[in-house]
Amino acid sequence: SGSCEVKTCWKAMPPFRKVGNVLKEKFDGATEVEQRKTGSTKVLVPKNSQFKPHTDEDLVYLDSSPDFCDHDLKNGVLGTSGRHCNKTSKAIDGCELMCCGRGFHTDEVEVVERCSCKF
């Protein structure tokens, strides 16, 4: 009798953390570009001529992000003024980052609650 050999190949996504790290790295090194017409085709070139041309692997953008610190209804940005922040956090919810250098006021609140504790 004959025997069969089966070979199965499939592609799998790398771990989510790895994908996130690669995207963050690309985001941090992204280049602002503009369209230029070369003959009958449009090409993307760095807006700042001192930057090297991008590759197919690079992340590029045409428009800068709005300033999320300031209120701008035209762009749907509510701003960060008046929001609650976390004084001890260094992340995006932290006061240093969220308040955009405007400074911030701190309030210390003590909450007294009744509980059904039994000793």
UniProtKB/Swiss-Prot annotation:
**Top-level taxon:** Eukaryota
Q: Name one GO cellular component term.
A: extracellular space
Q: How is it modified after translation?
A: Palmitoleoylation is required for efficient binding to frizzled receptors. Depalmitoleoylation leads to Wnt signaling pathway inhibition.
The cellular location(s) given in this protein's UniProt record come to:
Secreted, Extracellular space, Extracellular matrix
**Which sites carry lipid of kind O-palmitoleoyl serine?**
1
Q: Does the keyword Disulfide bond apply?
A: yes
* Gene3D superfamilies named among the record's database cross-references: 3.30.2460.20
Q: Does the keyword Ligase apply?
A: no
**One GO process term, biological-process aspect:** cell fate commitment
Record-annotated disulphide pairs: 69-100, 85-95
Attached carbohydrates are found at: 86
Which GO molecular function entries does the Swiss-Prot or TrEMBL record give? cytokine activity; frizzled binding
PANTHER family cross-referenced by the UniProt entry: PROTEIN WNT-4, WNT RELATED
Q: Which family does it belong to?
A: Belongs to the Wnt family.
**What role does it play?**
Ligand for members of the frizzled family of seven transmembrane receptors. Plays an important role in embryonic development.
Under which name does UniProt file this protein? Protein Wnt-4
Task: State the organism of origin.
Answer: Sceloporus occidentalis
Q: What is the lineage of its organism?
A: Eukaryota, Metazoa, Chordata, Craniata, Vertebrata
